[in-house]
UniProtKB/Swiss-Prot annotation:
This is Replication factor C large subunit. Part of the RFC clamp loader complex which loads the PCNA sliding clamp onto DNA. ATP binds at G48, P49, P50, G51, V52, G53, K54, T55. The keyword Nucleotide-binding applies.
Amino acid sequence: MPLQWFLKYRPKTLNEVENEEDAKKELVEWIESWLKGKPNYKAVLLYGPPGVGKTTLAEALARDYKLELFEMNASDSRNLNDIRTMAERASITGTIFGIKGKLILLDEVDGLNARADAGAIDAILELINKTKYPIILTANDPWDPSLRPLRNAVKMIELKRLTKYPLKRILKKICEAEKITCEDEALDFIIEQSEGDARYAINMLQGVAEGYGRVTLDMAKNLVRRKDRELDPFEALRGVFWAKYYWQAKSAVTDTQIDYELLMRWLDENIPLQYDNLEDVWRAYDALSRASLFLTRSKLVGWDLLSYTFDLMGPGIAFASLEKKKPTYKAKWVKYQFPQYIQQLAKTKEIRDALDTLLRKIGQAIHASKDKTLNDFLPAFIIYYRKYQEKLDKELELTEKEKDVIKLISSFYEGSKVEIEEPEKKEPSKRRTTSYRRKS
């Protein structure tokens, strides 16, 4: 079986990587800071849609800087012990002659499931914290709430979809190397269907070339189909808000694998950002509320009603703006926001969990229940903590999150103290008061 072209013609060096100049610059600065022994971040997260070259970029970096690449796939190493074992292998395995050091690549971290892969995220964070070598993580969608601890621990570097002309240069080079006749119109068609995915475009080019011996527009139309891919939340929002036709808006909703209730949260958060006119905002929210109603009914009555949910979430919101009826209408660019509702849930859960463990630690030290510690001893502990912070940090083995909770509670007590110590001064009243005794 012939070697797949996307592997055969994969870039070997950073200079050969097309269209990612900003990402390459950031990556080079990061690896050089590591080689100097002063990295600002021990790990980077390369993120972007499938086929943009995340793994390729990591491999090219290792080759340029003569680093031995130690690759792990997060979707294969799914728990605490697996990742720890592979990390230990990376740290003790000797390097090949002539190699300066190692580069650890952890692929597809967004393939981890917070529940099914319990401990995996913690293991990766532990690996980052203790590593002696630079670490690169990759993800298609890094915005999953379960990956938030990772996002906070790494440098984020975005890789963008390949635009038409860089992708066309890649395909032309392959045609020349394989001595295949390729029509420009055929390459344009393949690029359009690939939606910026270089791997998909190269695979389609190879399929046509090996099937016919050359590549013409008619041949490409016979074999190449639009790439079937999942839309991320930002693409889904753009698909809805920027749609000019009914089918475009509906496809934006049906082509994404995001949970429908979660997508509603995204739409809810971003409708006011996209639409300026208050009547447009009202119509959009009216459509969204009806979509929510039909989604609930579909669960109770029958899934046939789900089509109405799609119609209202997509076209209903897309055409809430009457401005779209104007021939000159152009959707404004908006930096879409992650749903605050989900962020707040995540924050409050983190605080609750940290407070719970803090109360348990204090309770164990003073032999009291969690409830009694909260109600009777916590205020005294806060005062004591201000004076003996280092000692208590060590004795109770407090985590950073638990320390943050103490600071939060301490600021609350300090605020209360100010109110008590600095009351509003009032002139004493000169009016005589008389007490009355109630007759029995």
